[in-house]
């Protein structure tokens, strides 16, 4: 089993799909990494040699991924909340921040409905 950036890459998947198991790497970035390393996207992860894996690790080291990316995202949201801007306010309240309506819909962001009895109290 290939281990890249502290993540076990599923061996039965194609390289392009397997790399998406790493947080911060999607299909497009995975494809570009494969191109830069000279590896076919359709090659299975278990078929990769140690040299191929090392090339992939070197390419991935150039990007912000996993814990660093999660930390950066969290800090960006925290900064928005600290400066008191509209987006930070919406994050704090758990509401959509990109102008969507909230009178109806927005259930994903607001959570499950509260019954009429809960609202009267």
From Swiss-Prot:
The keyword Ribonucleoprotein applies. It comes from the Bacteria. GO terms for biological process: translation. InterPro entries: Rbsml_uS13_C, Ribosomal_uS13, Ribosomal_uS13-like_H2TH, Ribosomal_uS13_bac-type, Ribosomal_uS13_CS. Belongs to the universal ribosomal protein uS13 family. It holds the Pfam family Ribosomal_S13. This is Small ribosomal subunit protein uS13. Residues 93-121 are annotated as: Disordered. One of its GO terms (cellular component) is cytosol. Keywords: Ribonucleoprotein, Ribosomal protein, RNA-binding, rRNA-binding, tRNA-binding. Located at the top of the head of the 30S subunit, it contacts several helices of the 16S rRNA. In the 70S ribosome it contacts the 23S rRNA (bridge B1a) and protein L5 of the 50S subunit (bridge B1b), connecting the 2 subunits; these bridges are implicated in subunit movement. Contacts the tRNAs in the A and P-sites. Part of the 30S ribosomal subunit. Forms a loose heterodimer with protein S19. Forms two bridges to the 50S subunit in the 70S ribosome. GO terms for molecular function: rRNA binding; structural constituent of ribosome; tRNA binding. The gene is rpsM.
């Amino acid at each position: 089993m290939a281990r890249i950036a502290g993540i076990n890459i599923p061996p039965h998947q194609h390289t392009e799909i397997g790399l998406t198991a790493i947080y911060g790497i999607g299909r497009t970035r995975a494809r570009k990494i494969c191109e830069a390393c000279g590896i076919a996207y359709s090659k299975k992860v278990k078929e990769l040699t140690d040299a191929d894996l090392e090339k992939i690790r070197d390419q991935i080291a150039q990007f912000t991924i996993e814990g660093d990316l999660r930390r950066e995202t969290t800090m960006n949201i925290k900064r928005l909340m600290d400066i008191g801007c509209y987006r930070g306010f919406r994050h704090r309240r758990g509401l959509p921040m990109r102008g969507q309506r909230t009178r109806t819909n927005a259930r994903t962001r607001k959570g499950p409905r509260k019954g009429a009895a809960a609202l009267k109290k």
